[in-house]
Amino acid sequence: MRNTVLNTLNAFPTQLGSNKSTLSSKIFHSYLGVLRPPTPLNTSMEVLGEGAHQNREAKRSSLRFEFCSALKECQKGKVPFGSSLRLEAAENLTFECETGNYHTFCPISCVRWLYQQIADSFFLVIGTKTCGYFLQNAMGVMIFAEPRYAMAELEEGDIAAQLNDYKELKRLCLQIKHDRNPSVIVWIGTCTTEIIKMDLENLAKLIEAELKVPIVVARANGLDYAFTQGEDTVLASLVNRCPSSHESSLDSMKLPSGGREKQINDVNTSKPEGYLSEVISLTSNGDDINKKSCTKPVPKKSLVLFGSVPNSVQTQLTLELAKQGINVDGWLPSRYSELPVLNKDVYVCGINPFLSRTATSLMRRRKCHLISAPFPIGPDGTRRWIEKICTVLNTDKSSTSLEEVQKNLQQREEKVWKSLQSYLDLVKKKSVFFMGDNLLEISLARFFIRCGMIVYEIGIPYMDRRYQAAELALLEQTCLEMNVPLPRIVEKPDNYNQIQRIRELQPDIVVTGLAHSNPLEARGVTTKWSTEFTFAQIHGFANSRDVLELITRPVRRNQNLDALGFTSLVKN
């Protein structure tokens, strides 16, 4: 990956700002074979080379050149936002798909935050030395901290099928049970287990039956598009272990876990004698009892939220819904003995945009009802998220109650926006470019546009349009309300092409992964690590300030450098 990144940046100039006129007049795409002369808009472009792929890429480049010119005119203030410069190609959201490399973390990094979120659990990563080195670097802890995760290193004998996988995994799980006594063991499959076709599911069933410890298998390997999809895989596996009723949940808690019996005493079994006669004597006649017993109770609409966030964020979102009269019946993930009940009467709603597999498992396997809502990132997204849940789960269908909820949320959102005014002044009319890393790009771009920023391009490794339909609709609505051109969404972006587009657009901030951050900074491009948005608390009204704190940090850094007389961080 290192050589690929360096070769990608060879064509990048050392200082972008030193030769803007040359860059704007003549831009050479060596990879695509496209030479772009200084011609006016809507003119034909000469394509050097053969093949339909080059013609298609040349057409995309022409449309992108028009789009970039319109954005620059709007940004300079020559033409007001939302005027006739809104090109025909950008009236609707434009989706493009490239075949770029995925310079991102491995999805097994989900162990870093899930082992803390699922209490009394133990994560066993089954992979090679490379996986172990990655976990040591990405999840380094103190020696005496005793983390609840480990690495099962595959050797040559395992890959060549000379060793018995069942005996080795049973030995490791028996040692984990003896040392840590977990309530559940989660096996994390890697690329190697996929390539050699290890049957982890059947092995887990056999070992679970012998050790009496639940074993969940999640194939969070590096064959996915983004590292955040590791959490999606683990949650989709946990969906199958959730009970279908409260009785089955009690039975699951009675199962032996870690060699110790967890007894649950049912308080309803110890009723005093004559209890039923006392209840009957308090009623006027027996006919009323028969009528009441014949009426079927209205099924309660249960709400389960899925997505891994810190406990403080869970409390904040739960309280926000409680203010509107909505009770949260469970969270996924949670402690194994406290997994929520999932059946056809349960409504589920996600809080992260990278949980499409979990949403599919909830609907198809457990017959739950998915609430399609924008994600609670930023004041605008949090308000729409709560409004959609209240609209679906509000038992009182009167328009007065819904209008009151919308009024309260609107006042709350306006109050939050006023508290963020100091950050909004910094980011207003700043341009941002997303290279794509963690699948949070659509939600973050929508929030930044609402803050007054201009988003040139949203690169995203993978996107499920059905799962993010509400978020995409809100993004389009936000652009119309803010009178800014709609950004282009590029799925699986090619890094070389992105470098050329960054050279054309010259954005103020580039949100990128760790692989490209330092090389771009060395070329004079202000960057922001997308990984920071993954691990920061960005959900809900209260955490909107943290999102703006992250995106304005490079802006404030550049302002401080200007005050000190420095023009860049790199020595000329």
UniProtKB/Swiss-Prot annotation:
<dbReference type="GO" id="GO:0009507">
    <property type="term" value="C:chloroplast"/>
</dbReference>
<keyword id="KW-0408">Iron</keyword>
<feature type="binding site">
    <location>
        <position position="106"/>
    </location>
    <ligand>
        <name>[4Fe-4S] cluster</name>
    </ligand>
</feature>
<dbReference type="GO" id="GO:0005524">
    <property type="term" value="F:ATP binding"/>
</dbReference>
<keyword id="KW-0479">Metal-binding</keyword>
<feature type="binding site">
    <location>
        <position position="191"/>
    </location>
    <ligand>
        <name>[4Fe-4S] cluster</name>
    </ligand>
</feature>
<dbReference type="InterPro" id="IPR005970">
    <property type="entry name" value="Protochl_reductN"/>
</dbReference>
<comment type="similarity">
    <text>Belongs to the BchN/ChlN family.</text>
</comment>
<keyword id="KW-0602">Photosynthesis</keyword>
<keyword id="KW-0934">Plastid</keyword>
<dbReference type="InterPro" id="IPR000510">
    <property type="entry name" value="Nase/OxRdtase_comp1"/>
</dbReference>
<comment type="function">
    <text>Component of the dark-operative protochlorophyllide reductase (DPOR) that uses Mg-ATP and reduced ferredoxin to reduce ring D of protochlorophyllide (Pchlide) to form chlorophyllide a (Chlide). This reaction is light-independent. The NB-protein (ChlN-ChlB) is the catalytic component of the complex.</text>
</comment>
<keyword id="KW-0067">ATP-binding</keyword>
<dbReference type="Pfam" id="PF00148">
    <property type="entry name" value="Oxidored_nitro"/>
</dbReference>
<feature type="binding site">
    <location>
        <position position="131"/>
    </location>
    <ligand>
        <name>[4Fe-4S] cluster</name>
    </ligand>
</feature>
<dbReference type="InterPro" id="IPR050293">
    <property type="entry name" value="LIPOR_BchN/ChlN"/>
</dbReference>
<feature type="region of interest" description="Disordered">
    <location>
        <begin position="249"/>
        <end position="268"/>
    </location>
</feature>
<dbReference type="GO" id="GO:0036068">
    <property type="term" value="P:light-independent chlorophyll biosynthetic process"/>
</dbReference>
<keyword id="KW-0149">Chlorophyll biosynthesis</keyword>
<dbReference type="GO" id="GO:0019685">
    <property type="term" value="P:photosynthesis, dark reaction"/>
</dbReference>
<protein>
    <recommendedName>
        <fullName>Light-independent protochlorophyllide reductase subunit N</fullName>
        <ecNumber>1.3.7.7</ecNumber>
    </recommendedName>
</protein>
<keyword id="KW-0411">Iron-sulfur</keyword>
<dbReference type="GO" id="GO:0016730">
    <property type="term" value="F:oxidoreductase activity, acting on iron-sulfur proteins as donors"/>
</dbReference>
<keyword id="KW-0547">Nucleotide-binding</keyword>
<dbReference type="GO" id="GO:0046872">
    <property type="term" value="F:metal ion binding"/>
</dbReference>
<comment type="subunit">
    <text>Protochlorophyllide reductase is composed of three subunits; ChlL, ChlN and ChlB. Forms a heterotetramer of two ChlB and two ChlN subunits.</text>
</comment>
<keyword id="KW-0150">Chloroplast</keyword>
<dbReference type="GO" id="GO:0016636">
    <property type="term" value="F:oxidoreductase activity, acting on the CH-CH group of donors, iron-sulfur protein as acceptor"/>
</dbReference>
<keyword id="KW-0004">4Fe-4S</keyword>
<keyword id="KW-0560">Oxidoreductase</keyword>
<comment type="pathway">
    <text>Porphyrin-containing compound metabolism; chlorophyll biosynthesis (light-independent).</text>
</comment>
<dbReference type="GO" id="GO:0051539">
    <property type="term" value="F:4 iron, 4 sulfur cluster binding"/>
</dbReference>
